[in-house]
Amino acid sequence: DIVLTQSPASLAVSLGQRATISCRASESVDNYGISFMNWFQQKPGQPPKLLIYAASNQGSGVPARFSGSGSGTDFSLNIHPMEEDDTAMYFCQQSKEVPWTFGGGTKLEIK
């Protein structure tokens, strides 16, 4: 299975500043010229919401302050400017190989 290592495990960012979350895969998640890396946001009591798919594409209705980048094994999610509503857990997920696997999560809070 592809192992995803997320960092940091927790992060506190001031309103209006930038939050950066990293995800490293144990092997490349690229195939057919596509990076099969996705990012999800989850709030307590709610299902995960897709923010970014294929490394850098925004999900439907996702604000422009969420952006993703990377290829191969190294990826990042950026949130800028940080808003109060962005407090949540964030997860990377690879969809290159079954079983699809998730990172351990990053808890994002307001500083």
Swiss-Prot record:
InterPro entries: Ig-like_dom, Ig-like_dom_sf, Ig-like_fold, Ig_sub, Ig_V-set, IgV_Light_Chain. GO terms for biological process: adaptive immune response; immune response. Residues 102-111 are annotated as: Framework-4. Keywords: Adaptive immunity, Disulfide bond, Immunity, Immunoglobulin. Residues 24-38 are annotated as: Complementarity-determining-1. Pfam families: V-set. Residues 93-101 are annotated as: Complementarity-determining-3. The keyword Ubl conjugation does not apply. Residues 61-92 are annotated as: Framework-3. It comes from Mus musculus. Transmembrane segments: none annotated. This is Ig kappa chain V-III region PC 2880/PC 1229. It comes from the Eukaryota. Disulfide bonds join 23-92. Residues 39-53 are annotated as: Framework-2. Residues 54-60 are annotated as: Complementarity-determining-2. GO terms for cellular component: immunoglobulin complex. The keyword Disulfide bond applies. The PC 2880 and PC 1229 sequences are identical. Residues 1-23 are annotated as: Framework-1.
